[in-house]
Amino acid sequence: MNLTELEEIGLKNVGKVYHNLGYDELIKHEIENKECILTTSGATAVDTGVFTGRSPKDKYIVDRDPSNRYIAWGDVNQKVSEEIFKELLEVAREQLSAKDLYVTDVYSGASVDSKHSIRFVTEIAWQAHFVKNMFIRPTELELKEFKPQFTVLNACKAVNDKWREHGLNSEVFVLFDIENNLSVIGGTWYGGELKKGIFSMMNYWLPLQNKLSMHCSANVGEKGDTALFFGLSGTGKTTLSTDPYRRLIGDDEHGWDDNGVFNFEGGCYAKVINLDGNNEPEIFNAIKSGALLENVVVNDKGEVDYNDGSKTENTRVSYPIEHIKNHETSLSAGHPENIIFLSADAFGILPPVSKLTREQAMYYFLSGYTAKVAGTERGITKPVATFSSCFGEAFLPLHPTVYAKLLGEKIDKHDVHVYLVNTGWTGGAYGVGTRMSIKDTRACINAILDGSIKESEFDTTKTFKLQVPKTLGNINPEILNPRNAWSDKEAFDKTTDMLANMFNENFKKYQVENSEFDYSEAGPKIES
């Protein structure tokens, strides 16, 4: 590439530039740089250092007109001044100058009308490998004419020593200058920052063009029927959308415009903790040469122990979507027939599957509920409720109601059916009940996708007023209505009221006067 392009973004005396290396070359560099371990599957395994997850409290957006008029400022979207941004940009430039660099050009967005050209600059080979896996890889012809619309400088070896003086959270910084189409990262090596940073930008660009951006997976059946799977991390988006009988469009980030649904990415980023080839064969078999494992434990023979979470429970693998045999090559499909909201309810209250009204769909979309299991100091574990608007609040620069309005319009226009599926616990909360089996969850999903769920008779649950099928295929009918699955009915009722209160408390932020988004009537009602 022309060095003047790097000089234009302030990088000086750059050494060798490894521009758009192929997989074999990247892996060779990773090995030579001692950045990775080669595993028996052919995949490379890397450690992301101190940070094995994103650093949301270190993410800032430059407070500048006109973008500051649209951004929902707060805990998710924190302000940083132009002066501090310029200072940290200089820190990153200094780190990357006089170094050998890896420059990778990719696209975000499979739609011709909505795709953005992105350039990543880093001094770490595996990070170039990661973005090559995760984003859409341009053709040779496209690369010849490539002009980046947005650039990411990853100076992960640099830190902000003046973070206290700047009034920031820590020495780590993940910064976005929307007007100058630039992102700067320092202090963290974690690959997910590269992926989710661009997702945040797509969530800014698209809705302003009246296109919906979504934190969801998507697949399409043989008859052309598209399904979307919304859910927070750990709810099963990747697992459940990776189906041998349906073509995978994508596992995490999508747009929805007048032509239909399209992937933002060209790869998958799957959790691999406790990965079992029998339960998830498509993902297991995707881990081969070209795949990049993060923070897994590898023995001296190069064998991976997927059950070992000693480095982190958030062990991951990125791989190009082509590693999934049954993927949709266009990365796009028509308008969805079904939308599925996934919640891993560790309280064991939500049904395995329920049919939502239009109002309930809006309520549960804005609530974005799941529950995680967190350890306490004494080693006791208990569920913790998590509410993340639109199932992805951490990545939404605009107010959640912007995305909700677009979703509601599209549900109405295309007559989409919406369901809530609990991939969490049944028969009791975490520690008492059991985790919903993948077999039963897949049976629920299959009944939605093949339409057989519509033939069921439905009951309405108390408190949450969710419509649940009385029978569904070979699933034990006792678990379909969650109260029936609990042996201790009094404990169920108490836990139900507790969870209902959490939902109601969370939704108060949308209950403002004259709000068109006050869907609280569709939420749970505690019965005296």
Curated annotation (Swiss-Prot):
Disulfide bridge map: none
Catalytic activity: oxaloacetate + ATP = phosphoenolpyruvate + ADP + CO2
Keyword Phosphoprotein listed: no
Any one GO BP annotation for this protein: gluconeogenesis
Annotated compartments: Cytoplasm
Entries under Pfam families matching the protein: PEPCK_ATP
Annotated residues for binding of Mn(2+): K196, H215, D252
Main location: cytoplasm
One GO cellular component term noted in the UniProt record for this chain: cytosol
Keywords: ATP-binding, Cytoplasm, Decarboxylase, Gluconeogenesis, Lyase, Manganese, Metal-binding, Nucleotide-binding
PANTHER family in the cross-refs: PHOSPHOENOLPYRUVATE CARBOXYKINASE (ATP), PHOSPHOENOLPYRUVATE CARBOXYKINASE ATP
Role according to the record: Involved in the gluconeogenesis. Catalyzes the conversion of oxaloacetate (OAA) to phosphoenolpyruvate (PEP) through direct phosphoryl transfer between the nucleoside triphosphate and OAA.
Protein name: Phosphoenolpyruvate carboxykinase (ATP)
Gene name of the record: pckA
